[in-house]
């Protein structure tokens, strides 16, 4: 009987552990796919950093004439703090703050303020792929990497990087059976080039 009890206990731990880790890998994969979707949406949506579209005009000066290469900048928008920071005050003086509506568009999808209510594939947001994602989990970086030019009518053409933060996985079975602690889902970052930083078609 002792042997049977030991074998049953070990089998239970192995089976329950396998279920937990399969769930972990599923959520990891879903989070990575959600980041890909977020980067694609960010490339064709209003920037989370308000005023970013005006930087190509704001940098024009005696030292940066129209048509010159855009000075480098990196703007980081953190959904947890609902703020954007820039590493180049001279270039980023036109930035005004953090646009919650723009962040919600990336997280929830166009025309939505919640998850799992996308009306079509064109309106899917990050949390439609992975419902645990909230704006507080998302970090978006806009970095000037050589494209575009000063005074460009369409604004700058930064490289956009989307990543997740503070997204723990809570073991269900192993937490109770063996005291496993929460595990941070591995970070995933996807970068793409901005195409048209506007959520609406231009009017002529």
Task: For each feature predicted by the language model, list its residue ranges.
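Membrane-proximal amphipathic alpha-helices
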Residues: 20-32, 47-48
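Short, conserved structural patches
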Residues: 36-204
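Homeobox/homeodomain signature
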Residues: 11-16, 31-33, 128-130, 180
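A broad detector of short, well-ordered amphipathic alpha-helices
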Residues: 3, 7, 29-37
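N-terminal single-pass transmembrane signal-anchor helix
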Residues: 1-23
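A general structural-boundary detector
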Residues: 18, 22-25, 93, 177
């Amino acid at each position: 009987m002792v042997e049977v009890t030991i074998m049953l206990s070990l089998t239970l731990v192995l089976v329950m552990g396998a279920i937990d880790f399969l769930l972990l890998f599923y959520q990891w994969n879903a989070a990575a796919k959600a980041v890909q979707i977020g980067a694609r949406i960010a490339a064709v949506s209003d920037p989370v950093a308000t005023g970013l579209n005006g930087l190509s005009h704001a940098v024009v000066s005696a030292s940066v004439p129209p048509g010159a290469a855009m000075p480098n900048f990196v703007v980081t928008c953190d959904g947890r703090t609902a703020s954007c920071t820039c590493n180049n005050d001279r270039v980023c003086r036109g930035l005004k703050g953090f646009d919650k509506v723009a962040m919600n568009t990336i997280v929830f999808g166009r025309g939505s303020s919640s998850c799992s209510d996308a009306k079509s594939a064109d309106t899917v947001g990050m949390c439609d792929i992975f419902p645990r994602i909230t704006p507080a989990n998302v970090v978006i970086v806009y970095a000037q990497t050589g494209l575009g030019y000063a005074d460009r009518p369409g604004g700058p053409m930064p490289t956009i990087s989307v990543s997740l933060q503070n997204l723990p996985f809570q073991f269900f079975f192993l937490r109770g059976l063996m005291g496993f602690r929460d595990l941070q889902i591995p970070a995933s970052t996807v970068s793409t080039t901005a195409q048209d930083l506007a959520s609406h078609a231009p009017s002529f």
